Amino acid sequence: MLQLILGGSGSGKTALLYQRIRTLAQAGKKSILLVPEQFTSSTEGRIYRELGDELSVMVDSFSFTSLAERILSAEGGAAVRTLTDAGRAVLVRRALEQLQDNVQYYYRHRRSAAFCQMAAQTIDELKSAGVSGTQLYDLAQSCGPEQAKLSELALIYQGYETLLAQTGMDPSDRLELAAGRLEAAQARGTMPELLQGRAVFIDEFDTFNAPKKRLLGALLASGASVTVALCDDGAPAEPGDLGLFSGAKQLAAQLRSLARKNGAEVAVPVLLRKDLRHQQAPGLAAVTR
């Protein structure tokens, strides 16, 4: 089941998440709290402050990356080597050398470390967007004057992926692999012990890239209760809306679609309307409205 907790900044979304986590912990039920990488340290501290010594052991906080590693440790794949940025740049150069005459624009840059690093970063961004080398090649055919360059980039991407399969994984591939392992476990009718009977709470995100969406989809398909807090005023989305909450509204719609695609129920969202952060300063509260 998916439930969204919606509200503006300072409306108490995170406080409500911790309240629900506490209630589950008091009932002897464990939870998982997913936050972005940069919030993992501060989240550990807040869990201890909010729940205390006895109840805090009922909660595990993860980033998507660390959760993926735990799944791989349980289901297999953790030992697969992950390439460094330097290793990924070397792989781009090797792909260029193998392509030779098939790439006219970019072959001469094969010995440029800066170009190879930039190409590796571009490939990483394409993966994050869920675009494969084949898809990029197909898209390039309708790009007019840029068709040739984009087609060559797609060939480099495809060559890179072929070499990567013989060498190791990109960091983003580990999330994809973890999602695949979780999907395979579900097909067998099993679940990693880490996820058995646990509610999942997600906070502090304003977007999810393609690998994270796949892992989130696998969690929803497992039947887990997934609660996501989003900075959204809860008003209906309007066509062409570019307002303050437009990104969150799009994300909320994507999450509801993802839940339904994976056979999960979508609960009625919780909407928090009060500005708790500025309740002692009504002037500031008026400015934020």
Predicted features and spans:
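Structural recognition of the conserved hydrophobic beta-strand(s) that form the central parallel beta-sheet
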Residues: 33-35, 61, 201, 225-230
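Conserved P-loop NTPase-based nucleic-acid remodeling module centered on helicase motor cores
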Residues: 28-144, 148
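Conserved Walker B
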Residues: 204-208
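Short glycine-/polar-rich loops that comprise or flank the Walker A/P-loop
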Residues: 27-30, 56-59, 196-197, 222-226
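Accessory N-terminal region flanking or inserted into the helicase ATPase core
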Residues: 1-4, 98-201, 236-243, 279-289
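Glycine-rich P-loop/Walker A and Walker A-like loops and their local beta1-loop-alpha1 context
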Residues: 1-48
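Hydrophobic helix-cap positions at the C-terminus of alpha-helices
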Residues: 20, 24, 182-185, 218-222, ...
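Conserved RecA-like helicase ATPase core segment
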Residues: 212-289
